[in-house]
C-alpha cells in the first residue's frame, strides 16, 4: 500500500468515527478543513461545505470541479456492528459512509493534493459538500453559485470507478382529483376516486413525443393514493403521488406542463431542481473516459450532479449496491485503485485539452 492510499484510509477512518448525518456535518467539515490546511491547500468553507483551489488558480482558464460529499444517511436499524467504529477485516473497511461516499471523498482529496501544484491546462477545484443525501438547501445548491465559473466536473460516488455519463432527473408530483361528495346508496355526487383512477390509467400508458438518445424514455410510476372518509360517502377528493424520472429530452418544467395538460387532476410538483444530465460523447470528459478504459453507463440513482448546469460525470470507488445498507463497507483495494484512476483520468483529460 503506497503512502497516498494509507493517508486516504486514515482520513476515512477518522471521518467514519465522526457522525455526520445530513444537516449535522459540522464536525466532519472541521476535520476536512483542518486536514486540507495542514497540507497547505488553503481551504475555504461555506456552511458545512469545504472547498479548495489549485495553486495558481486562474479564472481565465477552464476549471475542473472535483466533488464528493461527507454527509451520510442515518444508520439502518439492522446494523450488526457499531456504524461509527471503523473496522478493518482483511480488505474490507466497515463503517457508515465508508462506501457512500467517504471513499470517493478521500480519494479525490488525495488526487487533488497530488495534482494541485502540477502544470495543467485547467484549474482544479475540490469541493467536499454537505446535505447531499437530503438535497438540502445548504449543500451544493448554495455552494455552486459561490464557486465562480466551472466548466466540467467529476462527481465522486460509488460506481466501481466506471463512468456514469448520465442521470435521470426526478420530479415528484402531488396530484389531487376533485369531485362532489354524496350518499353512496343513491349514486349521488361526482366520485373523485374515479377521476383519479382515470388519470392514473392515463399515466400508466402515457408516452412523450421525444425520447432521449442516452437516457431513454421518461419513466412514470404512481406510488401513493388516498381517498375517502367512510364507506357510504362518495369521496370529493382523491390524492395520489407520481414519481417521474425525467430526461434531457424535456426540461423538468416542460415535463410537468405536458402532464398537467393530460390530466384532469390538479398537478403540483414538489420541486423541479433535480434535473437530468447527459454527457455528449464528443466532450473531453467522455473522450477521457474511453481513453482510460472506463466503461460508461446511465446511473439509476441521483446525486449532486443533478444540480450542475455544466458537463459532468459520476465516478468513484465502491459499489452503489452497498450504499444505505447495514454493515456498509468499502474495499481498501478500491480506494487504492480509485486514487490511481482519478490521477490517470485527469492527466488524460489534460492531454485531450
Regions found by a protein language model. Give the residues of each.
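N-terminal helical capping/dimerization or prosegment-like subdomains
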Residues: 1-75, 237-241, 258, 332-336, ...
Amino acid at each position: 500500500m503506497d503512502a497516498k492510499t494509507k493517508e486516504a484510509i486514515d482520513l476515512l477512518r477518522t471521518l467514519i468515527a465522526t457522525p455526520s448525518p445530513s444537516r449535522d456535518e459540522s464536525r466532519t467539515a472541521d476535520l476536512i478543513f483542518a486536514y486540507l490546511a495542514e497540507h497547505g491547500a488553503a481551504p475555504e468553507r461555506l456552511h458545512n461545505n469545504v472547498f479548495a483551489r489549485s495553486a495558481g488558480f486562474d479564472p481565465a482558464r477552464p476549471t475542473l470541479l472535483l466533488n464528493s460529499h461527507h454527509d451520510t444517511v442515518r444508520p439502518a436499524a439492522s446494523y450488526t456492528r457499531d456504524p461509527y467504529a471503523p473496522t478493518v477485516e482483511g480488505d474490507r473497511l466497515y463503517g457508515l459512509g465508508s462506501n457512500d461516499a467517504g471513499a470517493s471523498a478521500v480519494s479525490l482529496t488525495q488526487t487533488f493534493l497530488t495534482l494541485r501544484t502540477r502544470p495543467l491546462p485547467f484549474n482544479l477545484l475540490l469541493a467536499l459538500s454537505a446535505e447531499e443525501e437530503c438535497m438540502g438547501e445548504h449543500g451544493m445548491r448554495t455552494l455552486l453559485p459561490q464557486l465562480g465559473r466551472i466548466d466540467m466536473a467529476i462527481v465522486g460516488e460509488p460506481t466501481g470507478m466506471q463512468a456514469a455519463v448520465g442521470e435521470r432527473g426526478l420530479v415528484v408530483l402531488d396530484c389531487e382529483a376533485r369531485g362532489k361528495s354524496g350518499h353512496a346508496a343513491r349514486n349521488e355526487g361526482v366520485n373523485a376516486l374515479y377521476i383519479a383512477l382515470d388519470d392514473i390509467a392515463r399515466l400508466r400508458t402515457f408516452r412523450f413525443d421525444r425520447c432521449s438518445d442516452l437516457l431513454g424514455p421518461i419513466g412514470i410510476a404512481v406510488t401513493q393514493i388516498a381517498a375517502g372518509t367512510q364507506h357510504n360517502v362518495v369521496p370529493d377528493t382523491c390524492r395520489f403521488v407520481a414519481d417521474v424520472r425525467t430526461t434531457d429530452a424535456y426540461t423538468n418544467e416542460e415535463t410537468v406542463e405536458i402532464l398537467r395538460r393530460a390530466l384532469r387532476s390538479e398537478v403540483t410538483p414538489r420541486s423541479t431542481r433535480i434535473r437530468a444530465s447527459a454527457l455528449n460523447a464528443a466532450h473531453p470528459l467522455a473522450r477521457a473516459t474511453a481513453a482510460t478504459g472506463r466503461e460508461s453507463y446511465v446511473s439509476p440513482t441521483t446525486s449532486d450532479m443533478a444540480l450542475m448546469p455544466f458537463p459532468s460525470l459520476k465516478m468513484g470507488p465502491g459499489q452503489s449496491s452497498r450504499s444505505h445498507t447495514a454493515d456498509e463497507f468499502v474495499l481498501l483495494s478500491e480506494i487504492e485503485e480509485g486514487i490511481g484512476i482519478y490521477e490517470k483520468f485527469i492527466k488524460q483529460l489534460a492531454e485531450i485539452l
